[in-house]
Swiss-Prot record:
Compartments it resides in: Mitochondrion
GO cellular component: mitochondrion
Disulfide bonds listed in the record: none
NCBIfam families: 2oxo_dh_E1 (TIGR00239), PRK09404.1 (NF006914), PRK12270.1 (NF008907)
Keyword Transit peptide: yes
Cofactor(s) listed in the protein's UniProt record: thiamine diphosphate
Top-rank lineage group of the source organism: Eukaryota
Family that this chain belongs to: Belongs to the alpha-ketoglutarate dehydrogenase family.
Main location: mitochondrion
Annotated function: 2-oxoadipate dehydrogenase (E1a) component of the 2-oxoadipate dehydrogenase complex (OADHC). Participates in the first step, rate limiting for the overall conversion of 2-oxoadipate (alpha-ketoadipate) to glutaryl-CoA and CO(2) catalyzed by the whole OADHC. Catalyzes the irreversible decarboxylation of 2-oxoadipate via the thiamine diphosphate (ThDP) cofactor and subsequent transfer of the decarboxylated acyl intermediate on an oxidized dihydrolipoyl group that is covalently amidated to the E2 enzyme (dihydrolipoyllysine-residue succinyltransferase or DLST).
Gene3D superfamilies: 3.40.50.12470, 3.40.50.970, Multifunctional 2-oxoglutarate metabolism enzyme, C-terminal domain, TPP helical domain
Keyword terms, alphabetized: Glycolysis, Mitochondrion, Oxidoreductase, Thiamine pyrophosphate, Transit peptide
Organism annotation: Dictyostelium discoideum (Social amoeba)
Protein name (Swiss-Prot/TrEMBL): Probable 2-oxoadipate dehydrogenase complex component E1 homolog
Length: 900
């Protein structure tokens, strides 16, 4: 083999390597050897600065002094001692060494590995990367490269001709992305990977979608013409073409090797799809029982401006080596146009390369000129090889250009005139490569013409099939595979009383098992007293508090074969030290999970996340997309912090099914409640979630219709039993919907907040509205009715009892969206003598449920057309931060609540 030898063939340490530099028989030989070694290190660390990686030659090429021979007292043509371990014996003089290093690090591909901590990884990477210059593609590989380039160019040209004003975000100037993807797919199949999950933005997405991932071109053209991507009878609003997804099986090596590729849906919120793709990959690995990542690979494609500018990229990279989120490494390809809309690199980042973002996790970085598709093909193979060996992320920075503006109707010369003068003079990458291999006699002009005409004819034929008289929808794939047997909610009958109960005897066993530990496992004494023993004492009274109900819900689902994954900050213990799914041995820090040791069919995955909301929630959403057989739960430390993940809520959780027909049963737990903790620890902003609900405010015939058309469920439960049923309902249904829970804080230990196990027995179900237990038997005497939701009920109940307001009924709305019209009507009918109605909430008037419930009460029910608001006045912040004022507000709220 010609090339630089491995630093660490036998996993030598730095010390042993350094020692070999100095241990020679001759001082002069030792000096030369050390100097050459330092020169090699200089090229490896700084050669990238001088590399020819920018096809537009806009990036300054910097020749570091560390590449100068004079710095090491070396001269051109100098002989090399044969005792130098790092240099192959075929390289006998310094000129050969320099030529080798120049080709490896200063040509149209370069690398940065110096920041990597692992000596073994660096040694492997240096050896493999330096070998690439002597690995020339075969004739068939070159033809394959050309065909991928030409197919991309033909697609862009066809679209420009047929739809000249359509914003397709074409790949012209970076067609080598297609070469990279093809190489990654092939190498994945060769390595017996079963799945590649792709998260990518708009640039080049349509090229990949149609020309490589087999999305039917006729369906695509039909959509571009303004038609729906959904066949008749499918409920959904759809999305733009640059967000469309596809799954396909790709065959290679004469159909001897294959890989399943999933290009998942994305929003235009750049990089938000990254953690979604990672989460879906993790779920695939879980179901394949190969958590090491040996069978499923995540491929993320990025734009150069977005990867440097969007914080979710850093959040996602930070997850890459955490045990609860590790997916065995991800291959990143940056489709680098050297511009973001109109933002030039000097305004878009503070470092030289957009790929520098990967250095903080020690990711290898390979930068390649997009005009060198053969190099692109080679480094893409190397990326998969590295990922398979070391199970870590690796980044390819593919530097090209963008032929048009951000979209095809944009004029880029308004802001980048000289850049686009350069671009418009350039031969396209496909045509340049075609000229190259035609000159090599590998492909003829006639073959190129025939291939081009064939591909154009295929697109034209598909275009004709997209006309109204010819078009037929391809089979929909949204409820196939693991999701077969489920339905869209529009097809459900009334499931408002769906039985979600479970055997009382088994629930008691689960609750007992939830605090059972091995005999040699020492639990903290205070925890043993206040948690474990307290739970067992409650069970003797047939009672369960909030955390016990949660354990019973999770445990019973596991008994039925469902898996449960709960993720978030401190979820193993719980923010309020209430959950303790993880117990810690006091002498060894060993973790024990009782629910995973009770012999259930399903598994519980408890993931204490890092301090991220956005990426982690997106990750869990992605996890939820893979299978309906896992209950995915994400809990915020406090509900207030959910706005750190607002993009995830808006673009994925509440709208994903409507846009993309992808169901998710994710549960989002948001501790909420006004207890004097101030603006950052009081409110999950209920009002914002309710504003996202797509349920009708008026013209509603019955609750069945509402359940059929809702995009998610929002509940504010006030009893452990109702929380128990809500969690189980998520899995017992034959469809999946996101569930947002305004969860409790003080109710976790409130003496009156408990449920009996009989309330969770077979035949019981989630109660959308809870009747007033204190007035249900004397309803005719009630003159005033309070409607409320959440923990404020307990304050109102206590005040009513203390002040003997016996003519007031208090009705709890446990489910706010979809709005339980019929159940509310039943309660109104129950109190037929009531003449006054009020909505009472602890939130401010411009928060909480009021803006959502007001039009529904006033327009649906004649009796409540004059319903009164009782609560805090409007506030700019979510809560008062002055404790004395908070206490006064609580007192005033209770006074007002019973004086209307």
């Amino acid at each position: 083999m010609i090339g630089l030898r491995s630093i660490s063939k036998n996993k030598q340490t730095i010390n042993s390597i350094s020692k070999s530099f100095y241990c020679t028989s001759s001082p002069s030989s030792s000096s030369v050897k050390l100097s050459v070694t330092r020169l090699i290190d200089g090229y490896r660390a700084h050669g990238h600065l001088a590399a020819n990686i920018d096809p537009l030659a806009r990036m300054e090429r910097i020749r570091s002094q560390l590449l100068d021979l004079d710095r090491y007292n070396l001269v051109k043509g100098q002989s090399i001692p044969s005792t130098i371990d790092l240099i192959n014996q075929d390289l006998t003089n310094l000129d050969q060494v320099v030529s080798f290093l120049e080709n490896a690090y200063c040509n149209d591909v370069t690398a940065q590995f110096d920041h990597i901590e692992s000596i073994e990884e660096k040694a492997w990477l240096y050896e493999k990367f330096e070998q690439l210059q002597h690995q020339n593609p075969s004739k068939s590989e070159k033809i394959n490269i050309l065909k991928n380039l030409i197919k991309s160019e033909i697609f862009d040209q066809f679209m420009q001709k047929k739809f000249p004003t359509f914003k397709r975000y074409g790949l012209e100037g970076n067609e080598s992305m297609m070469v990279s993807c093809d190489s990654i797919f092939r190498e994945s199949a060769k390595n017996q990977l079963k799945n590649v999950v792709i998260g990518m933005p708009h640039r080049g997405r349509l090229n990949l979608l149609v020309q490589m991932c087999n999305y039917p071109a006729k369906d695509f053209f039909w959509k571009v013409k303004g038609n729906s991507e959904f066949s008749e009878g499918i409920l959904g609003v759809g999305d733009v073409t640059s967000h469309i997804a596809v799954s396909t099986d790709l065959q290679f090596n004469n159909n001897k090797e294959s890989v399943h590729v999933s290009l998942i849906h994305n929003p235009s919120h750049l990089e938000a799809v990254d953690p979604v793709a990672a989460g879906k990959t993790r779920a695939k690995q879980f179901y394949e029982k190969n958590e090491g990542g040996s069978e499923s690979l995540c491929l993320m494609l990025h734009g150069d401006a977005a990867v440097a500018g969007q914080g979710v990229v850093t959040e996602t990279l930070q997850l890459s080596q955490l045990s609860g989120f590790n997916i065995g490494g991800c291959v990143h390809v940056i489709v680098n146009n050297q511009i973001g809309f109109t933002t030039v690199p000097t305004n878009g980042r503070s470092n030289r390369y957009s790929s520098d973002i990967g250095k903080f996790i020690g990711a290898p970085i390979i930068v390649v000129n997009s005009q060198s598709p053969e190099q692109v093909e080679k480094v893409s193979r190397l990326a998969v090889e590295y990922r398979q060996k070391f199970k870590k992320d690796i980044i390819i920075d593919l530097i090209g250009w963008r032929k048009f503006g951000h979209n095809e109707v944009d004029e880029p010369s308004f802001t980048q005139p000289t850049m686009y003068q350069n671009i418009r003079k350039r031969q396209s990458i496909p045509q340049k490569y075609a000229t190259q291999i035609i000159s090599q006699g590998i492909f003829s002009e006639q073959e190129l013409l025939e291939f081009t005409q064939k591909e154009q004819a295929i697109l034209e034929e598909q275009f004709q099939l997209s006309t109204p008289e010819n078009f037929k929808y391809s089979p929909m794939d949204h409820l196939q595979g693991k999701w077969s047997g489920l339905i869209q909610s529009k097809h459900i009958a009334d499931d408002s009383k769906l039985d979600t109960g479970y055997s009382v005897e088994e629930l008691s066993e689960i609750a007992n098992d939830s605090v059972k530990v091995p005999s040699d496992f020492q639990v903290h004494q205070r925890l043993l007293r206040s948690f474990s023993n307290a739970r067992l004492e409650k069970l003797k009274q047939n009672q369960a508090d909030w955390a016990t109900a949660e354990s019973m819900a999770v445990g019973s689902l596991m008994k039925q074969g469902y898996n449960v994954r709960i993720s978030g900050q401190d979820v193993g213990r719980g923010t309020f030290s209430q959950r303790h799914f993880n117990l810690t041995e006091q002498n060894s820090d060993r973790i024990y999970q009782p629910l995973n040791n009770m012999g259930a069919k399903g598994e519980l995955d408890v993931v204490n996340s890092n301090l991220s909301e956005f990426a982690v929630l997106c990750y869990e959403y992605g996890y939820s997309l893979e299978s309906p057989d896992t209950l995915p739960i994400w809990e915020a430390q406090f509900g207030d912090f959910i706005n750190g993940a607002q993009i995830a809520i808006d673009q994925f959780v509440t709208s994903g099914e409507s846009k993309w027909l992808r169901q998710s049963g994710i549960v989002i737990l948001l501790p909420h409640g006004f207890d004097g903790a101030g603006p950052e620890h009081s409110s999950c902003r209920i009002e914002r979630f309710l504003q996202l609900s797509d349920t009708e405010a008026v013209n509603v015939k019955d609750d069945t219709l509402i359940n059929q058309e809702t995009n998610f469920y929002f509940i504010n439960p006030s009893t452990p039993a109702n929380y128990f049923h809500a969690l189980r309902r998520q899995m017992i249904r034959n469809y999946r919907k996101p569930l947002i829970v305004a969860g409790p804080k003080v109710l976790l230990r409130h003496p009156n907040c408990f449920s009996t196990l009989n309330e969770m027995a077979p035949g019981t179900h989630f109660q959308t509205v809870l009747s007033d237990p204190d007035t249900i038997n004397n309803a005719s005497t009630i003159k005033r009715v309070i409607f409320c939701s959440g923990k404020v009920f307990y304050d109102l109940q206590e005040e009513r009892k203390a002040k003997n307001f016996n003519d007031v009924a208090i009705i709890r709305l446990e489910q706010i969206a979809p709005f339980p019209y019929q159940r509310i009507q039943e309660e109104i009918n129950r109190y037929s003598n009531a003449t006054k109605f009020a909505w009472v909430q602890e939130e401010q008037q411009n928060g909480g449920c009021w803006s959502f419930v007001e039009p529904r009460f006033k327009q649906r029910y004649p009796q409540t057309s004059q319903i009164k608001y009782i609560g805090r006045p409007p506030l700019a912040a979510s809560a008062i931060g002055i404790s004395s004022i908070h206490k006064k507000e609580v007192s005033q709220l209770l006074i007002d609540a019973f004086n209307f």
